[in-house]
Amino acid sequence: MRVHYLKIIGSKTEADLLGWVNEVCQPETEVKGFNDPQFADGRLLIKLSSAIEPRIINWDLVTPGETDEDKELNAKYAISIARKLGAIVFLVWDDIPKLNKKMILIFVCAMYDLKFNIA
């Protein structure tokens, strides 16, 4: 499955994927790269999931992401939602607050794949 996501990465540029992220998250935010600090609180990844299936998100469980504990909770929730949607997730929760660029890129590819049914 990771090879599948790597094929998506190969067929799309980072700019294409970031464009989709920015399209989904407008007007609140604009990310410049997959190591953008705005990914650190997990809220952007949750918002990407809501673009696929809005009813899956319980916004009462999403924290402001201001503390390390909030970031951990949001990251775990984002991963949980992605798995419920059917994504194969390779990252662990602490890849998100640590801004592991490669893992966040693969997570976004998984969400992109679900949204546009590339498989």
Language-model features: locations:
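Alpha-helical coiled-coil scaffolding segments
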Residues: 1-119
